[in-house]
Amino acid sequence: GVQTCALPISTLEKISRAGTSIWLDDLSRSRLLINDEKSLLHLTRTANVVGVTTNPAIFSNALKDASTYNDAIAALRGKDADTAIRLITTEDVRSACDQIKDIFERTSGVDGRVSIEVDPRLAHQEQATVIQARELWSEVDRVNLFIKVPATKAGLPAITQLIREGISVNVTLIFSLERYREVLLAYLDGLDARLADGKNLDGIQSVASFFVSRVDTAIDPLLDAHTDPRAKDLRGKAAVANARLAYQVFEEISASDRWLRIAHSGGAVQRPLWASTGVKDKAYHPAKYVTELIAPDTVNTMPEATIYAAQSFTGEISHSIAGTYASSDEVFNQLAELGISYDAVVTELERDGISKFHDAWEGLIATISAQL
């Protein structure tokens, strides 16, 4: 017969086909302007990148390397730093939205999304968060935008309100299973409220950004300080176990009568998005938080280095969450036996996550103020 020569399927293609969308956790004007292997367009063509996430730390780093922003900043002299940051970041995000709009259309709005964060100083203010999210939504003015709202207690009702208004939300800084469940329900509340308002659910999407590596970064040192021989075996297990158990919550809610009713009315599932997936510990494979968290209806947003680490991974790519719930539970049972409190760790991580973004925002203001 005829010999067909099929190209080998790349690792990134396999990950994508298994249901995990690959997004780039980075954005800068140079990625939008240049036409080399670091550009956003190049990564969409060669590395299966189908979305972009940003945060205050990312913009702070981008603006420190300011050569590509000189003209933009010069044009904003006389404006205050907050206004300048808003204008510069929304311009970058709008350009990124335009560059990946074709992916948005090809995937019926599931991918091809770019996320921009509300000012982290508003993390504990529900109304101020809603107001700024509306402003960002109308200023960027692109259907393929996500507004990032932190999963604080104040953030939850803000998420419900924004979804009700038809604004697509990326819920960020989720560390605990309990809070993740509340996020899913806040999303369903928003969809239900919108249906009760007599509006349709067309075009409304959401992702829930569940943070991964920071859990190991917090728990591993506690294990290293332990004398119990079991402690060593638990290194590098908590973060993946936590994310896998989050997926179990996602599956449970996705099978609920309430969700099936909303889905029947056109609601889109809120996908779990694995964030903070760069490996901080040299003892681990640099793609650990990618290859161990592959499952349908998920997103993994990665720094560029992690995308390349995943690309060069030679092991098997398969649904790596299925069948792991019992062993994941066991990880936390053992941690508890060693006196490591899950609740204490995740509560501290949320507080720390907000203050990190807060500090990055202050750094951003300082960087811009110096140039205005």
Question: Which residues does each predicted region cover?
Answer:
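Flexible, acidic glycine-rich loops studded with aromatic residues
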Residues: G266-L372
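Glycine-enriched alpha-helix->loop->beta-strand junction motifs that scaffold or abut catalytic
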Residues: N48-V49, D141, A158-V169
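Active-site-adjacent beta->alpha loops and helix N-cap segments on the catalytic face
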Residues: L33-I34, Q125-V130, V149-I163, S176-L188
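Hydrophobic faces of well-ordered beta-strands that scaffold small-molecule active sites
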Residues: T20-D26, V50-T54, G112-V118, L145-V149, ...
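Active-site beta->alpha loop and helix N-cap motifs at the rims of alpha/beta catalytic domains
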Residues: T54, I58-A158
